Design a protein with these regions (language model features):
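Long amphipathic alpha-helical scaffold segments
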Residues: 68-171, 177-186, 196-237
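C-terminal motif of bacterial Sec signal peptides marking the signal peptidase cleavage site
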Residues: 6-9
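Periplasmic-binding protein-like
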Residues: 259-268, 285-287, 328-332, 380-407, ...
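Bacterial signal peptide processing site
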Residues: 11-14
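Extracellular/periplasmic periplasmic-binding protein-like sensory domains
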Residues: 414-488
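Extracytoplasmic ligand/sensor domains, especially the bilobed periplasmic-binding protein
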Residues: 262-265, 269-343, 347-357
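Beta-alpha junction/loop-to-helix N-cap segments that form part of ligand/metal-binding clefts
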Residues: 167, 186, 192-292
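Segments of small-molecule ligand-sensing domains
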Residues: 474-540
């Protein structure tokens, strides 16, 4: 039965490569998939023909690539004696078999394999693999980056994202020159910051990076034990490519043709999606992260971002270390807030905690209305639903609150929490770096007494000389300090790229956090914690 159905598919394939006398319906794709499923992965020429017949019917890029990858996997698993009986007019199948021969003869020589594939593409221009090579085959054409990679930096250097691209570029290029040494005293004075941009696109990125600032004052961070590692040395020239309004395939082709073997960037998520879907034979350290359901293990693609989800995971870990049992996550009423709450709950439960609770708040204006009416924030919430089995239902009183808010919001949220509970039942308060603007005066610091918050090492007293250097490069715009720190760490990661893929124990004390590598080569940042205590900002105890 399988053979009969597969041969029917072969007839459709043959027609699509010659006269195309019939147009198969989209429903045929499901029909072919049922044949593939019935084969249960057992390699055969019949199933290869079904994959070939199904391929032109798949319009979704992910499904189309999966078809090609599955065909190639099956082909590489077949023994030579199984690859028999190919008709003269089966051009697509003949092309795949020829490509297999090229791969087997050159799989230990990436350069020769690339040359062979390029020649194959000229001989089989209509084969679907000529446009979309199998992912596994692409991986075989990629050489290791090595100790001195030639780096192409993909950033928005014009248009609305220019300010962010420039901050990252400055950190990256300053790291190439080497970081200033840390002074003997680690006491640090954080600089003032400017207003937000007022631009929708820029403000969207600010939401992911930091809050805007509207005062001019200084915040002193007490002596800190946080450190930033020395950066690698690489004298190869770095070329910056402006991604604004540019198509990723053209930029990647230009960079590789000029001899660059590592791309750092792009920054915008849409560009990261585009470069990931290209399946290009070049190593990439993307400066943003895709959603979890879009990540796939690739030996030439890593992700590094200033992820607010990482901060939420940091908070969950910190609370567990301090013995907290019943957390409440207080976030904006938005998809952004939902993402943060989910990330916190997943990490909380992964570390042995029970169900975490969530409560949302509205705009600053609505918070002010509530506080004027004497309405506080009660320590209640709804369970955060995450796909975890066997987690106990939350019980008892809230003993810790993780607040994701801007400074203006936090100045309202904290007293609203205190209004609703007695002083003997007050939970420990934790905030994200979103609330830290480095410009708090003494009144604010006393008002925030006891609040703990996470922050990047560059702004947590790790290296005062480096902070002063950064201050001049980002024009005292405090929100850009974190992006400058990201640029420094992108340099360190780029020059350790081979270790990211091959060393699960890789660690570096970076300017944006303690960096480690998680699944799918996603870089995770662990941040130090600070605390408002007696009118000062000190390392959290």
């Amino acid at each position: 039965m399988l053979s009969t159905l597969a041969l029917t598919g072969c007839q459709i394939e043959s027609s699509t490569t010659t006269t195309a006398t019939q147009q198969p319906s989209v429903s045929d794709a499901s029909h072919y998939q049922s044949i593939i499923d019935a084969a249960q992965g057992k390699p055969s020429m019949d199933v290869l023909r079904v994959y070939i017949s199904q391929e032109p019917l798949l319009t979704d890029p992910a499904q189309h690539q999966a078809n090609i990858d599955s065909l190639w996997l099956m082909l590489t698993q077949m023994k030579p004696e199984q690859i028999q009986g190919i008709e003269a007019d089966e051009n697509i199948l003949l092309g795949w078999v020829d490509l297999l021969d090229i791969y087997q003869n050159n799989k230990d020589d990436p350069e020769a394999l690339r040359t062979g594939i390029d020649d194959w593409k000229t001989r089989y221009p209509h084969n679907p693999g000529a446009k979309n090579l199998p992912t596994a085959l692409v991986q075989g054409t990629i050489t290791k980056v090595g100790a001195n990679p030639r780096i192409a930096l993909f950033l928005p250097m014009s248009g609305q994202g220019q300010v962010f691209g420039q901050a990252i570029m400055q950190g990256f290029l300053d790291a190439q020159k080497g970081l200033p040494s840390s002074p003997v005293s680690q006491a640090s004075t954080a600089p003032a910051a400017s207003q937000g941009s007022g631009n929708d696109v820029l403000d969207q990125i600010y939401q992911e990076v930091a809050a805007t600032v509207n005062e001019n004052a200084n915040t002193e961070v007490a002596s800190s034990t946080v450190s930033i590692d020395a950066v690698p040395t690489n004298t190869q020239s770095v070329k910056v490519f402006d991604t604004q309004g540019k198509a990723m395939p053209q930029l990647v082709a230009q960079a590789t043709s000029e001899g660059y073997n590592l791309i750092v960037g792009p920054l915008l998520k849409s560009d990261v999606q585009a470069i990931a879907q290209m399946n290009a034979p070049v190593n990439v350290l993307a400066l943003n992260e895709l959603d979890a359901n879009q990540l796939q293990p690739r030996t030439n693609l890593c992700y590094f971002s200033l992820s607010p989800e990482d901060e939420a995971k940091n908070a969950a870990n910190q609370m567990r270390l301090e013995g907290k049992q019943m957390p409440l996550v207080l976030v904006p009423a938005s998809p952004f807030g939902d993402r943060i709450a989910k990330a916190f709950a997943e990490e909380w439960q992964a570390k042995g905690g029970g169900t975490a609770l969530m409560q949302t708040f509205g705009s600053t204006a609505s918070l002010k209305e509530s506080i004027n009416r004497g309405q506080g924030i009660r320590m209640t919430g709804t369970p955060i639903n995450v796909a975890t089995q066997g987690v106990e239902q939350a019980n008892g009183s809230i003993d810790a609150v993780y607040i994701v808010a801007t400074r203006d919001e936090l100045t309202l949220v904290k007293p609203m929490i205190e209004m609703a509970i007695s002083s003997r039942q007050r939970p420990a308060l934790y905030a994200s770096s979103r609330s830290n603007q480095g410009n708090s005066n003494a009144d604010y610091r006393f008002e925030m007494e006891g609040v703990k918050f996470s922050e990047v090492p560059l702004l947590a007293g790790a290296n005062n000389n480096l902070r002063k250097q950064a201050q001049g490069k980002v024009n005292n715009d405090y929100s850009l300090f974190r992006l400058y720190a990201m640029g420094i760490d992108a340099w360190s990661l780029a020059n350790n790229y081979d270790n990211l893929q091959n060393n699960g124990q890789f660690r570096v004390n970076g300017a944006s956090g303690m960096l480690s590598v998680h699944e799918n080569c996603v870089i995770y940042r662990e941040l130090p914690w600070l605390q408002f205590k007696q009118g000062q900002v000190k390392p959290a105890q």
